[in-house]
Amino acid sequence: MPAYQNAPASPGNISKFKISSNVSDKALDLSGGVVEFRYYESVLSNSITATAVVVDSGYEGDGGSVKAAKGVLDSLPIRGGERTDIAVEDNLGNKLKFKDGLYVNRVRDADPGTQKDVFFLDFASAEFFANEQQRVMQRFEGKISEHVKEIIGTINGKFEQLDNTSLSYNFIGNDRKPFYTCTWLASKAVPDKDVGSRAGFLFYQTRDGFNFRSIDKLFEQDPVKTFIFNNTGETPPEVDANVLASGTKIEKLE
């Protein structure tokens, strides 16, 4: 069974960074031009996001030769909404893949030059875009966990884990966005095993799907790793790592 490890931070290898055009069948692999890639997910974020820094030399492969070409922003073109299939591997062999791809949210900070262009690409999940176009309108009756499951289904979202709730809560959508509604419901939810004073729920997305989790149930789980935060940078023997230690990096092997 794979386990978590601590390892010195080091560059990873982007083995695939394929962007597909929205206006043709053309697709380009920019893995050789991506100089920085940052991926974000958080229990406080409704959607996964990522940012890439791309250096475009203005040349592309043509069989065994290289020829001049328009920049990728204009040749593909990249305007927003393009699906991007990404695969990253670190120095420990951990592989990060996005089975449903990520989608270009915006192109920013383009810096054209005489020999190369540099620009940033911001990415989000497909459900992020669907959330912007969908509204919750109808009346809901029953348990909150069932409401959340139905609402996320309207944007074709899939759940990684959904904790059941107790008690019934009835409401009308009032033309709100799905993510907003689910976050609002999370603050009112009570886990099914207890109807007393509880901490509520968290609604967030990982690359494996959406999660609607009871905060109490999360804290009842056995810890995977123990970390300490102090100004000395030293790690006592009873903990796994110091948050401030130089080069500390937490990896999940899969």
Task: Locate predicted features.
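Assembly/oligomerization scaffold segments
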Residues: 1-133
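Short beta-strand-centered interaction patches in the first periplasmic/extracellular domains
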Residues: 118-121, 125-127, 162-253
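Subunit-assembly interface segments of extracellular/virion macromolecular structures
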Residues: 130-132, 138-139, 151, 185
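Second-shell loop/turn segments in exported
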Residues: 132-141, 167-173
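Extracytoplasmic/secreted envelope proteins and their assembly/folding machinery
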Residues: 145-149, 182
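Structured segments of extracytoplasmic/periplasmic soluble domains
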Residues: 150, 154, 188-191
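Active-site palm subdomain of RNA-directed nucleic acid polymerases
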Residues: 159
